């Protein structure tokens, strides 16, 4: 199996090395062909490696970084002061050819800006988009973008997102002629912002895109479309709302609510029935757990950059690492570039 080397921004996210280092070790243990470059403060990282097996340590290198970009820093300021930060160094490792992908749970705006500066967008792409693959109720998956990289999007950007999402659905989900929809406040053609209506008009005329029209937020997990396109503001709010609802639902399955108005004593058969239902429902809906699809790819770059949730736990960050590996092995940037050349106009 071909060896892979990934760079991890070990200091990014809400929990920094406390999550990223154990997740890195988990990924190394599961993937013998994986090497990792942990970028960050050695004083914070090294103690977490004290009891690690020598085989894992042989495939791990700590790359020192002087500082970290704060999660609440303004992207423009963060980029100007980014030299020496763990995020920038991790991206530079891709640029210099030492790593094939980067994973960070840090500041989204800064990651977007630095990735565009250092890795460069593909020909014909104005701005990369954050994209993730979400499960739906038909036991399939839906490509959703943009999830927060671009708050303001014009119609041209939405069309580019549609093309990239369609290519990803074909290459990653192996779908033929994937359905593409625009997320809107209604399915009527007159609904929505002018940018959405203009994008719809362009997509209708694009022979390479199987555009099916507008869909609403409640259609996201129904399987009505293979690709859902929206601007980054709407996408981020939608994603986090869905994740919040799913987490609440799964927590209720594990521990049914009880309160002053509810009887605490139940017969043995009711307790048995409750546990049985919890187990079956948890198994039935467990695939919706947001931790299992953490990690959004910055689609449209010449390299692979994965953005993890800032609040990701060890399991979720390990999933983001796995996604980076899959993206590299599928050569997604190269395959998308080849398709984009045929369907998008080249930039000046």
Curated annotation (Swiss-Prot):
Q: What is its EC number?
A: 2.3.1.274
- Specify the superkingdom: Bacteria
* GO aspect biological process, one term: phospholipid biosynthetic process
User: Does the keyword Cytoplasm belong to this entry?
Assistant: yes
What compartments host this protein? Cytoplasm
- Quote the InterPro entries the UniProt record gives: FA_synthesis, Phospholipid_synth_PlsX-like
Substrates-to-products reaction catalysed = a fatty acyl-[ACP] + phosphate = an acyl phosphate + holo-[ACP]
Matching Pfam families? FA_synthesis
Question: Which pathway is recorded for this entry?
Answer: Lipid metabolism; phospholipid metabolism
Q: Give the record's keywords alphabetically.
A: Cytoplasm, Lipid biosynthesis, Lipid metabolism, Phospholipid biosynthesis, Phospholipid metabolism, Transferase
Q: If you read the UniProt record, what top EC class would you report for this enzyme, in one word?
A: transferase
Q: Name one GO cellular component term.
A: cytoplasm
Q: GO molecular function terms here? A: phosphate:acyl-[acyl carrier protein] acyltransferase activity
Which NCBIfam families does its entry note?
plsX
Instruction: Describe its assembly.
Output: Homodimer. Probably interacts with PlsY.
Protein family membership: Belongs to the PlsX family.
Function noted in UniProt? Catalyzes the reversible formation of acyl-phosphate (acyl-PO(4)) from acyl-[acyl-carrier-protein] (acyl-ACP). This enzyme utilizes acyl-ACP as fatty acyl donor, but not acyl-CoA.
Q: What is this protein called?
A: Phosphate acyltransferase
| Gene of this entry | plsX
């Amino acid at each position: 199996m071909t060896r892979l080397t990934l760079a991890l921004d070990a200091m990014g996210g809400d929990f920094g090395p406390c999550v990223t280092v154990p997740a890195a070790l988990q990924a190394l243990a599961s993937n013998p062909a994986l090497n990792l470059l942990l970028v960050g403060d050695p004083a914070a990282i090294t103690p977490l490696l004290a009891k690690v097996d020598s085989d894992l340590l042989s495939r791990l290198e700590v790359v020192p970084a002087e500082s970290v970009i704060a999660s609440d820093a303004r992207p423009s300021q963060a980029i100007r002061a980014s030299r020496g930060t763990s995020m920038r160094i991790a991206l530079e490792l891709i640029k210099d050819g030492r790593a094939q992908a980067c994973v960070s749970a840090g500041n989204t705006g800064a990651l977007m800006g630095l990735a565009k500066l250092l890795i460069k967008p593909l020909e014909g792409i104005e701005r990369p988009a954050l994209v993730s693959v979400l499960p739906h109720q038909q036991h399939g998956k839906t490509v959703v973008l943009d999830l927060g990289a671009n708050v303001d999007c014009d119609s041209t950007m939405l069309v580019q997102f549609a093309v990239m999402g369609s290519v990803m659905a074909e290459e990653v989900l192996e779908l033929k002629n994937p359905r593409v929809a625009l997320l809107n406040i209604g399915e009527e053609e007159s609904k929505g912002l002018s940018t959405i209506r203009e994008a719809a008009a362009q997509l209708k005329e694009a022979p390479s895109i199987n555009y099916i029209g507008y869909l609403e937020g409640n259609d996201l997990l129904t399987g009505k479309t293979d690709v859902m396109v929206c601007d980054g503001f709407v996408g981020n709010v939608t994603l986090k709302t869905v994740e919040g609802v799913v987490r609440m639902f799964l927590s209720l399955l594990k521990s049914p609510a009880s309160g002053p108005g509810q009887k605490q004593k139940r017969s043995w058969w009711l307790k048995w029935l409750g546990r049985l239902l919890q187990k079956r429902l948890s198994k039935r809906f467990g695939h919706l757990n947001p931790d299992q699809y953490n990690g959004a790819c910055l689609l449209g770059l010449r390299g692979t950059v994965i953005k993890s949730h800032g609040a990701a736990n060890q399991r979720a960050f390990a999933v983001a690492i796995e996604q980076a590996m899959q993206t590299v092995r599928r050569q997604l940037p190269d395959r998308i570039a080849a398709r984009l050349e045929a369907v998008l106009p080249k930039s000046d």
